[in-house]
C-alpha cells in the first residue's frame, strides 16, 4: 500500500511538472500572439489589426503572393509584398504563385546572381542576402495551416547588434529613414529581424523606432510552422550610410555619400526625444569637456592626468562617461551638451552624431595605427551640415603603449602565431592597409592600452581649436543651390572678313531674389560647333562680349550657369546656338 501511494505521488508530481511546463509554453505563445497584435493589444485598436482568417486564406490560395520592388540591383532594392510567407521549419520565405500573383522585377534565374536583395545595409555581403522559394498556391493544401500576421512588417537583418557603431550606422539610421520612405510605415510597422542574433546589448534602442515591439527570428517559431504576412516591406535603404568596412577593399568612406549632417541631426533629434533627453544646453560658464572612459581594453593609462591637463588648457571642467557604467540616455545627455568629446578610437564615438554644432571631436589612436586608414568617425564629423571640428591624435611613442600578446586572438593576442610572425608584428611601426576582419596585426595594435603624451595631444588639438571650444550659434550652413539662369540670348556682329564679336546675356535665377548669398558668379562655356573642346569663363556680370578667337560666319554653342559662394554650382540653362 505504501509503495502504491509513493507511485501515485510520483505520478502526480510528474503530471504536475508536465502540465506546468505546458502552461508556461502556452503563456509564452500567448504573449507573443499579443505582441503580434492579434486583436488583443489595447494600444493597437483591434478592428484595424484583426485578420478575417477565411477571407485571408482564400485570397492567398487563389491569388497568391504579390511583389513589387524599387531599385535596379540587389544592393539598392527594397521590395513590397502582399501575402509573403515564411516557413519556420525550412527557415525560408515562400512566394506562392496564384491567379493574381505579380513579381516585379521578374528576374528568372538572375534572382540567384547573387540574390534578390540585401537584408542589411552592409552592401553585397554574402551572409545578408534575401531570397525566397517558389510554390504553387495549391501546395498550401498540403502544408501546415498558415498563421496570418496582420501587422505591416518591415523585414531586415541587423548586422552586428552588439557593436554601437554598427547599431547606429547599419541599423538604426537606415531603419529610421526606410520607415519614412513609405507613407504611414513609421506608425504602423512592426520590425522583424531575421539574422538570427539574440536581442543584443542595445535592443532598447531598436524599440524606439516603432510603437510595436520588434520580433526576432527565434520568436517566430512559437507562433506557427507557417507564417504569412498580409503586408511586408523587405530590405533597408542604404542612403544614410557613409562608411564601408573593408570586406572587398580596405575600409574607408563610401565612394558616393548621399547623406548630410541635416539628416543625421534630424535622426539624432528623434532619438533624444525618445530617450527624454532635453535640448536646453548648459548655462554659460558650465561648459565641459567629455572624455570617454573605457574599462576593459584600449585604455587611457593616464586618464586622470589627461583630465587635469584638458581642464587647465581650456579652462573648463572635464567629465568622464562610459558605456559600461552609464545608461545610454545619460551618455546621450552628456554628449549632446559637451563642448569637446575626447575618446580612444572605438564604437562609442558614433555618439558624435549627438554633439551640438560647433563642438570638437578628438579621436585618439594607439601606437602603429594610422588615423588616415580608419575614418568612420572623422567621416561622420565632417559631413556637410554636421558643423563639427575634428582632431585625430596618434601615439608615436612605443614606450607609451602596453600590449597584450597573451590574450585570445579576437582581443589582440598573437601567441597563436608562429614566432617569426610575432616578431614581425612586434617590430612593425604601422599596421599596413588590410581587409576586414581578422588581421592579427590590426587586432594586436587596436587593443593596446595607451599612455597619452599630453603635450603632443594639446598641440594637435590647438592646431584645429584656436580659441575656447564649444557650441556656437551658427546660421544654417546647408547650401541652397541656384536655379537655371533665365532668358539667355546672344547677339553677334561681324567686322570685316576676320573679326567678329559675340555678346551673351541672361537674367538671374528666379530663386536668387529670395536668398541671401555672399557671392554670385556665372560660368559660361563657349564651343565652336563641330569641335570637341570648349573654353570656360567665370564672370561676375550678366552679360559679356567675347572677341578672342571668335570667327565670322561660324556657329557657336553656349552654356551658362550660376554659382553661389564658389562651390554651389547650379544647372546649365538650355544650350544657346549663336551664329556670327
UniProtKB/Swiss-Prot annotation:
Transmembrane intervals: 5-25
Pathway(s) this gene product operates in, as recorded in its UniProt entry: Protein modification; protein glycosylation
Record's bilayer topology term: Single-pass type II membrane protein
Glycosylated residues, chain numbering: 99, 276
Catalytic activity: 3-O-(alpha-D-mannosyl)-L-threonyl-[protein] + UDP-N-acetyl-alpha-D-glucosamine = 3-O-(N-acetyl-beta-D-glucosaminyl-(1->4)-alpha-D-mannosyl)-L-threonyl-[protein] + UDP + H(+)
InterPro entries the UniProt entry points to: FN3_dom (IPR003961), FN3_sf (IPR036116), Glyco_transf_61_cat (IPR049625), Glycosyltransferase_61 (IPR007657), Ig-like_fold (IPR013783)
Lumenal side: 26-580
Ranges for domain Fibronectin type-III: 488-580
Cell compartment(s), UniProt: Endoplasmic reticulum membrane
Name of protein: Protein O-linked-mannose beta-1,4-N-acetylglucosaminyltransferase 2
Keywords: Endoplasmic reticulum, Glycoprotein, Glycosyltransferase, Membrane, Signal-anchor, Transferase, Transmembrane, Transmembrane helix
Primary localisation category: endoplasmic reticulum
GO biological process, one term: neuron migration
Amino acid at each position: 500500500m505504501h509503495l502504491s501511494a509513493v507511485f501515485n505521488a510520483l505520478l502526480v508530481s510528474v503530471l504536475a511538472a508536465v502540465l506546468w511546463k505546458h502552461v508556461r509554453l502556452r503563456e509564452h505563445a500567448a504573449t507573443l500572439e499579443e505582441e503580434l497584435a492579434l486583436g488583443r493589444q489595447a494600444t493597437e485598436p483591434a478592428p484595424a489589426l484583426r485578420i478575417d482568417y477565411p477571407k485571408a486564406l482564400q485570397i492567398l490560395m487563389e491569388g497568391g503572393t504579390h511583389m513589387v520592388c524599387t531599385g535596379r540591383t540587389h544592393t539598392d532594392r527594397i521590395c513590397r509584398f502582399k501575402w509573403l510567407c515564411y516557413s519556420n521549419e525550412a527557415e525560408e520565405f515562400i512566394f506562392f504563385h496564384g491567379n493574381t500573383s505579380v513579381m516585379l522585377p521578374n528576374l528568372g534565374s538572375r534572382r540567384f546572381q547573387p540574390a534578390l536583395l540585401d537584408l542589411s545595409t552592409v552592401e553585397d555581403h554574402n551572409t545578408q542576402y534575401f531570397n525566397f522559394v517558389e510554390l504553387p498556391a495549391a501546395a498550401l493544401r498540403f502544408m501546415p495551416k498558415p498563421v496570418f500576421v496582420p501587422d505591416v512588417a518591415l523585414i531586415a537583418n541587423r548586422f552586428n547588434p552588439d557593436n554601437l557603431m554598427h547599431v547606429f550606422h547599419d541599423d538604426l539610421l537606415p531603419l529610421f529613414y526606410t520607415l519614412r520612405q513609405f507613407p504611414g510605415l513609421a506608425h504602423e510597422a512592426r520590425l522583424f529581424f531575421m539574422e538570427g542574433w539574440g536581442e543584443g546589448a542595445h535592443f532598447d534602442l531598436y524599440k524606439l523606432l516603432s510603437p510595436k515591439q520588434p520580433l526576432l527570428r527565434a520568436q517566430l517559431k512559437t507562433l506557427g510552422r507557417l507564417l504569412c504576412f498580409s503586408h511586408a516591406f523587405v530590405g533597408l535603404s542604404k542612403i544614410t550610410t557613409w562608411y564601408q568596412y573593408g570586406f572587398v577593399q580596405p575600409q574607408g568612406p563610401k565612394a558616393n555619400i548621399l547623406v548630410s549632417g541635416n539628416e543625421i541631426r534630424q535622426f539624432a533629434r528623434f532619438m533624444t526625444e525618445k530617450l527624454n533627453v532635453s535640448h536646453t544646453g548648459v548655462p554659460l560658464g558650465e561648459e565641459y569637456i567629455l572624455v570617454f572612459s573605457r574599462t576593459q581594453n584600449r585604455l587611457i593609462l593616464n586618464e586622470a592626468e589627461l583630465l587635469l591637463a584638458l581642464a587647465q588648457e581650456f579652462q573648463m571642467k572635464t567629465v568622464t562617461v562610459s558605456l559600461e557604467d552609464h545608461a545610454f540616455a545619460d551618455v546621450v545627455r552628456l554628449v549632446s551638451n559637451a563642448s569637446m568629446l575626447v575618446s580612444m578610437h572605438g564604437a562609442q564615438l558614433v555618439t558624435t552624431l549627438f554633439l551640438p554644432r560647433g563642438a570638437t571631436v578628438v579621436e585618439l589612436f594607439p601606437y602603429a595605427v594610422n588615423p588616415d586608414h580608419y575614418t568612420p568617425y572623422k567621416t561622420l564629423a565632417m559631413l556637410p551640415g554636421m558643423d563639427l571640428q575634428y582632431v585625430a591624435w596618434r601615439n608615436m611613442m612605443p614606450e607609451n603603449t602596453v600590449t597584450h600578446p597573451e590574450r585570445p586572438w579576437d582581443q589582440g593576442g598573437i601567441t597563436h602565431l608562429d614566432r617569426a610572425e610575432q616578431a614581425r608584428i612586434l617590430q612593425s611601426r604601422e599596421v599596413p592597409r588590410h581587409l576586414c576582419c581578422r588581421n592579427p596585426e590590426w587586432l594586436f595594435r587596436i587593443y593596446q592600452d595607451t599612455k597619452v603624451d599630453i603635450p603632443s595631444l594639446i598641440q594637435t588639438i590647438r592646431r584645429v581649436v584656436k580659441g575656447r571650444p564649444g557650441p556656437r550659434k551658427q546660421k544654417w550652413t546647408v547650401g541652397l543651390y541656384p536655379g537655371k539662369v533665365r532668358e539667355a540670348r546672344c547677339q553677334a556682329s561681324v567686322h570685316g572678313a576676320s573679326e567678329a564679336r559675340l555678346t551673351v546675356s541672361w537674367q538671374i535665377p528666379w530663386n536668387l531674389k529670395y536668398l541671401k548669398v555672399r557671392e554670385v558668379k556665372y560660368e559660361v562655356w563657349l564651343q565652336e560647333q563641330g569641335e570637341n573642346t570648349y573654353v570656360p569663363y567665370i564672370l561676375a556680370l550678366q552679360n559679356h562680349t567675347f572677341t578672342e578667337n571668335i570667327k565670322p560666319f561660324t556657329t557657336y554653342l553656349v552654356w551658362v550657369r550660376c554659382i553661389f559662394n564658389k562651390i554651389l554650382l547650379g544647372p546649365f540653362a538650355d544650350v544657346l546656338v549663336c551664329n556670327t
